[in-house]
């Protein structure tokens, strides 16, 4: 899932915004692509040091600490955006903030916990790539299909 998400947002290289570092899996996949810069916003106090340590060996990574919504006005525009914060309670804020973060051709995706292609987030013209997966039995995601949202501006 994270590999496919990274491949989509990094397809054209450029400047990438990742909202939510988590375990750093997607960040690692993003760096398997040729990207100019990688801006990561992380809010969780236990994850911030892990993100900073991960980024310390990379010259093109900037870690911004805090809530993404509180810092959004200081951000630039990006060629790719991956939104993966804990829970989806801020997706409406994210969808209404996208226009200030994108330019022509920007690719956007997000963690989609929905079991189908339903677009609950008021983001028009979203395509979905169906991925066949085999999650571990003890995983919180227990479907054999994942619907990767793809939005290009």
Question: Where are the regions a protein language model picked out?
Answer:
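Conserved alpha-helix/loop element of class I SAM-dependent methyltransferases that forms part
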Residues: 1-14
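A short acidic, Gly/Pro-enriched loop at the edge of an enzyme's catalytic core
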Residues: 69-81, 85, 89
């Amino acid at each position: 899932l994270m590999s496919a998400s990274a491949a989509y947002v990094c397809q054209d290289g450029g400047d990438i915004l990742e909202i939510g570092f988590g375990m750093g899996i997607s960040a690692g996949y993003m760096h398997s692509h040729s990207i100019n810069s990688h801006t990561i916003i992380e809010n969780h106090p236990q994850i911030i040091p892990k993100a900073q340590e991960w980024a310390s060996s990379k010259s093109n990574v900037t870690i911004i600490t805090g809530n993404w919504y509180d810092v959004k006005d200081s951000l630039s525009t990006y060629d790719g955006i991956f939104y993966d914060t804990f829970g989806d309670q801020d997706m409406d804020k994210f969808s209404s903030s996208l226009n200030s973060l994108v330019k022509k051709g920007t690719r956007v995706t997000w963690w989609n916990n929905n079991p189908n292609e339903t677009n609950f987030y008021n983001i028009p013209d979203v395509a979905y790539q169906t991925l066949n997966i085999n999650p571990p039995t003890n995983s919180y995601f227990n479907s054999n299909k994942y619907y990767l949202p793809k939005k290009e501006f």
